[in-house]
Amino acid sequence: YSLRARPRF
């Protein structure tokens, strides 16, 4: 999924 939207994978 979007890694930019989440600080952690």
From Swiss-Prot:
Signal peptide: none annotated. The keyword Kinase does not apply. Coiled coil: none annotated. GO terms for biological process: neuropeptide signaling pathway. Limited to neuronal cell bodies, neuronal processes and sinus gland. It is found in: Secreted. Keywords: Amidation, Neuropeptide, Secreted. Belongs to the NPY family. May act as a neurotransmitter, neuromodulator or neurohormone. This is Peptide tyrosine phenylalanine 4. It comes from Penaeus monodon.
